[in-house]
Amino acid sequence: RDSRAASANGGDGKAPRVARWMGNEKVLLLTFPDAATQRRALGRASMYLEDPEHRGRVAKALPAGARGGVANYSGHNARVRELVAFYNDARGDDGRGAWEDERAMMEALVDAGVVRKEKCGRVSVSAEWSRGRGRDGWGDGEPSTTRRDVVPEACVIAVCASGDAREVQDALLHEAMHGLWYARDDFARWCYDFYLGDALDDAERAAWVEFLRELRYDVSVEEIVVNEFQAYMATERVLFGPDTCAGKSSSSKKSS
């Protein structure tokens, strides 16, 4: 099921398509018309949520090159409430701080019924989706990202279009695993137990953290570390596959 919204700037075709995953309606897929639009719509939000220098702060511009980090990845993911928090901060006191493509994305989520727009222009998660919806009813308690109190919530994932179908498939699988993390509390808890249990030793966990640090993730946040671990280990076939052992060059499928 999907819906399409007009652009925040008068129907210029830049609004993303919003589709719900049939297997779990809490997972929403955003499809943008091109990679540049997706980067402008989600780049600053990803920095706000995952970048070590900008976490919790709205960047004034998107960094280029190696310093681009999470802003430059071809895949993005976030809880809807996290996107809402970013957008409200980005708007600023005068309501004009959000970029055009960020506004178009939020309007698409409003039209999909996932986000509610207030008269003042601020947004909030629609009550129907504030804890997510599923066969087992609603999650309860306050939303949390702590290890033992993960509440299933509505989330969005996005993947850039590309002429390489295999690349798109790999990136989509990676982002879908993040969707499961947000939407299924039992899955997230299992991943925490695996990562922090006896399956890995301290040296292996340290190596993983260093890998994420080089990709410019905020490794001080345990959820980021474990969430990325499960997504990479469940789907990565290039960086950690047999081709790597054969000495073939490779790059992260998330890099654009």
Annotate each predicted stretch with a short phrase.
Residues 34, 160-163, 177, 185, ...:
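Short, flexible loop/turn elements at secondary-structure junctions
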Residues 92-149:
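Long, low-complexity, polar/charged, intrinsically disordered or flexibly structured peripheral segments
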Residues 1-5, 10-33, 131-158, 196-256:
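Metalloprotease/metallohydrolase-associated module, dominated by Zn2+-dependent proteases
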Residues 1-100, 104:
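N-terminal low-structure segments adjacent to metalloprotease catalytic domains
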Residues 185-197:
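Short acidic alpha-helical/loop segments enriched in Asp/Glu that coordinate divalent cations
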Residues 155-172:
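Short pre-active-site segment immediately N-terminal to the catalytic Zn-binding motif
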Residues 170-183:
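Active-site recognition of the HExxH zinc-binding catalytic motif
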